[in-house]
């Protein structure tokens, strides 16, 4: 599992011209699942570690301008969007290969579980995109601050 976490002052996701998810200040999270991920991933220590990191990362500024506050501290929102392209390989040619991405059904199941588990721990609103849909994602990368978490780094 790969998570790209971006601090945002707000954002939204549209599908077919309709807003399906919208947040205020918080984090925008692109979540992708790879072939190495299995249906047992949500039961692993790594799963909970990544969720806790996502919510607990101190990437919001305190009164002194230092990144000392977490999403919990600011009661920030989360916008979760599935993104299989995080597993793109560009080693050959100019067209990315996505053979490293998890099968669509498994990825959908894992994304649904991620939404459920993040929602239980989130300090405020959790909004999502629509799995497998062509989406327009609009948000302000505040800072910018972008952090990448990869499950293989926590095994």
Swiss-Prot record:
A Gly-cisPro motif from one monomer fits into the active site of the other monomer to allow specific chiral rejection of L-amino acids. This is D-aminoacyl-tRNA deacylase. GO terms for molecular function: D-tyrosyl-tRNA(Tyr) deacylase activity; Gly-tRNA(Ala) deacylase activity; Ser(Gly)-tRNA(Ala) hydrolase activity; tRNA binding. Its EC number is 3.1.1.96. One of its GO terms (cellular component) is cytoplasm. One of its GO terms (biological process) is D-amino acid catabolic process. The gene is dtd. It comes from Maridesulfovibrio salexigens (strain ATCC 14822 / DSM 2638 / NCIMB 8403 / VKM B-1763) (Desulfovibrio salexigens). PANTHER family: D-AMINOACYL-TRNA DEACYLASE 1, D-TYROSYL-TRNA TYR DEACYLASE.
